[in-house]
Amino acid sequence: MTNLTLDVNIIDFPSIPVAMLPHRCSPELLNYSVAKFIMWRKETGLSPVNQSQTFGVAWDDPATTAPEAFRFDICGSVSEPIPDNRYGVSNGELTGGRYAVARHVGELDDISHTVWGIIRHWLPASGEKMRKAPILFHYTNLAEGVTEQRLETDVYVPLA
Protein backbone atom coordinates (compact mmCIF):
# COMPACT_ATOMS: atom_id res chain seq x y z
CA MET A 1 0.00 0.00 0.00
CA THR A 2 1.27 3.48 -0.77
CA ASN A 3 1.13 6.66 1.28
CA LEU A 4 -2.39 8.10 1.38
CA THR A 5 -1.11 11.60 2.11
CA LEU A 6 2.24 12.96 1.05
CA ASP A 7 4.58 14.77 3.39
CA VAL A 8 6.77 16.67 0.92
CA ASN A 9 9.89 18.61 1.89
CA ILE A 10 12.15 20.79 -0.24
CA ILE A 11 15.84 20.07 0.23
CA ASP A 12 19.18 21.10 -1.22
CA PHE A 13 20.66 17.80 -2.32
CA PRO A 14 24.47 17.64 -2.59
CA SER A 15 26.15 16.09 -5.62
CA ILE A 16 27.16 12.54 -4.69
CA PRO A 17 29.86 10.42 -6.36
CA VAL A 18 28.42 7.01 -7.21
CA ALA A 19 29.16 3.69 -8.82
CA MET A 20 26.63 3.50 -11.65
CA LEU A 21 25.24 0.67 -13.75
CA PRO A 22 23.12 1.94 -16.65
CA HIS A 23 20.05 -0.12 -17.59
CA ARG A 24 19.03 0.54 -21.20
CA CYS A 25 16.25 -1.84 -22.13
CA SER A 26 12.83 -3.03 -21.03
CA PRO A 27 11.82 -2.17 -17.45
CA GLU A 28 10.69 -5.80 -17.16
CA LEU A 29 14.40 -6.76 -17.26
CA LEU A 30 15.48 -4.24 -14.60
CA ASN A 31 15.85 -6.90 -11.91
CA TYR A 32 18.59 -8.56 -14.00
CA SER A 33 20.58 -5.33 -13.96
CA VAL A 34 19.94 -4.93 -10.23
CA ALA A 35 21.26 -8.48 -9.66
CA LYS A 36 24.36 -7.62 -11.70
CA PHE A 37 24.95 -4.50 -9.57
CA ILE A 38 24.52 -6.53 -6.38
CA MET A 39 27.09 -9.07 -7.63
CA TRP A 40 29.51 -6.21 -8.38
CA ARG A 41 28.97 -4.77 -4.89
CA LYS A 42 29.57 -8.10 -3.18
CA GLU A 43 32.59 -9.00 -5.30
CA THR A 44 34.40 -5.67 -4.97
CA GLY A 45 33.24 -4.36 -1.59
CA LEU A 46 33.52 -0.83 -3.01
CA SER A 47 29.96 0.26 -2.26
CA PRO A 48 28.75 -2.04 0.54
CA VAL A 49 24.99 -1.91 0.96
CA ASN A 50 25.24 -1.60 4.76
CA GLN A 51 27.61 1.42 4.57
CA SER A 52 26.62 3.16 1.34
CA GLN A 53 23.53 4.82 0.00
CA THR A 54 21.63 3.09 -2.83
CA PHE A 55 19.87 5.08 -5.54
CA GLY A 56 17.88 4.61 -8.71
CA VAL A 57 17.95 7.28 -11.40
CA ALA A 58 14.72 7.30 -13.42
CA TRP A 59 15.25 9.00 -16.76
CA ASP A 60 11.98 7.76 -18.22
CA ASP A 61 8.46 6.76 -17.20
CA PRO A 62 8.12 3.02 -17.90
CA ALA A 63 4.39 3.49 -18.55
CA THR A 64 4.96 5.89 -21.46
CA THR A 65 8.39 4.89 -22.82
CA ALA A 66 8.96 2.18 -25.41
CA PRO A 67 10.75 -0.75 -23.74
CA GLU A 68 13.83 -0.45 -25.98
CA ALA A 69 14.14 3.28 -25.11
CA PHE A 70 13.75 2.92 -21.31
CA ARG A 71 16.65 4.32 -19.21
CA PHE A 72 17.35 3.74 -15.52
CA ASP A 73 20.64 3.87 -13.59
CA ILE A 74 21.37 1.72 -10.54
CA CYS A 75 23.77 3.51 -8.18
CA GLY A 76 25.63 3.14 -4.91
CA SER A 77 27.54 5.93 -3.19
CA VAL A 78 31.33 5.58 -3.17
CA SER A 79 34.17 7.32 -1.36
CA GLU A 80 36.78 6.72 -4.07
CA PRO A 81 36.79 6.18 -7.84
CA ILE A 82 36.07 2.63 -8.96
CA PRO A 83 38.29 0.76 -11.41
CA ASP A 84 37.19 -0.72 -14.73
CA ASN A 85 35.34 -3.99 -14.20
CA ARG A 86 33.60 -6.77 -16.08
CA TYR A 87 30.15 -5.75 -14.81
CA GLY A 88 29.96 -2.44 -16.67
CA VAL A 89 29.73 -0.45 -13.43
CA SER A 90 31.36 2.96 -13.90
CA ASN A 91 31.99 6.19 -12.02
CA GLY A 92 29.15 8.69 -12.01
CA GLU A 93 27.66 11.52 -10.02
CA LEU A 94 24.16 12.29 -8.86
CA THR A 95 23.37 15.89 -9.70
CA GLY A 96 22.86 18.16 -6.73
CA GLY A 97 20.28 20.91 -6.46
CA ARG A 98 16.81 21.58 -5.11
CA TYR A 99 14.46 18.61 -4.87
CA ALA A 100 10.98 17.94 -3.54
CA VAL A 101 11.21 14.77 -1.44
CA ALA A 102 8.50 12.42 -0.20
CA ARG A 103 8.79 8.97 1.32
CA HIS A 104 7.19 5.99 -0.40
CA VAL A 105 6.48 3.05 1.88
CA GLY A 106 5.76 -0.31 0.31
CA GLU A 107 6.30 -2.22 -2.88
CA LEU A 108 8.37 -0.59 -5.60
CA ASP A 109 5.75 -1.59 -8.18
CA ASP A 110 3.52 1.08 -6.59
CA ILE A 111 6.11 3.88 -6.45
CA SER A 112 4.51 5.68 -9.40
CA HIS A 113 1.64 6.66 -7.07
CA THR A 114 4.09 8.68 -4.95
CA VAL A 115 5.86 10.14 -8.00
CA TRP A 116 2.58 11.26 -9.58
CA GLY A 117 1.29 12.51 -6.22
CA ILE A 118 4.21 14.93 -6.08
CA ILE A 119 4.05 15.94 -9.75
CA ARG A 120 0.27 16.18 -10.25
CA HIS A 121 -0.88 17.39 -6.84
CA TRP A 122 1.88 18.81 -4.66
CA LEU A 123 3.84 20.61 -7.41
CA PRO A 124 0.94 22.72 -8.78
CA ALA A 125 -0.24 23.61 -5.26
CA SER A 126 3.28 24.58 -4.16
CA GLY A 127 4.02 27.04 -6.96
CA GLU A 128 7.30 25.21 -7.63
CA LYS A 129 8.40 24.14 -11.11
CA MET A 130 10.05 20.89 -12.09
CA ARG A 131 13.61 21.06 -13.43
CA LYS A 132 14.57 18.98 -16.48
CA ALA A 133 16.52 16.23 -14.74
CA PRO A 134 15.83 12.63 -13.76
CA ILE A 135 13.81 11.61 -10.72
CA LEU A 136 15.91 9.96 -8.01
CA PHE A 137 14.92 7.09 -5.75
CA HIS A 138 16.87 6.65 -2.51
CA TYR A 139 16.31 3.15 -1.16
CA THR A 140 16.72 3.83 2.57
CA ASN A 141 16.30 0.42 4.19
CA LEU A 142 17.62 -2.22 1.82
CA ALA A 143 18.64 -5.19 3.92
CA GLU A 144 18.21 -8.90 4.12
CA GLY A 145 14.84 -9.73 5.59
CA VAL A 146 13.04 -6.44 4.82
CA THR A 147 9.80 -7.35 3.07
CA GLU A 148 8.64 -5.38 0.04
CA GLN A 149 5.70 -4.06 2.03
CA ARG A 150 8.15 -2.46 4.50
CA LEU A 151 10.55 -0.93 1.97
CA GLU A 152 11.12 2.80 2.43
CA THR A 153 12.13 4.81 -0.62
CA ASP A 154 12.61 8.56 -0.73
CA VAL A 155 11.40 9.99 -4.05
CA TYR A 156 13.35 13.08 -5.22
CA VAL A 157 11.67 15.28 -7.86
CA PRO A 158 14.08 17.93 -9.24
CA LEU A 159 12.98 21.55 -8.79
CA ALA A 160 13.94 24.63 -10.82
Swiss-Prot record:
Origin superkingdom: Bacteria
Alphabetical keyword list: Repressor, Transcription, Transcription regulation
Keyword Transmembrane helix: no
Residues spanning the membrane: none
A Pfam match: GyrI-like
GO biological process, one term: negative regulation of DNA-templated transcription
Database matches in InterPro entries: AraC_E-bd, DNA_gyrase_inhibitor, GyrI-like, Reg_factor_effector_dom_sf
Physiological role: Represses expression of mcbR.
PANTHER family: TRANSCRIPTIONAL REGULATOR YGIV-RELATED (PTHR40055:SF1)
Protein name per UniProt: Probable transcriptional regulator YgiV
Organism: Escherichia coli (strain K12)
Record gene name: ygiV
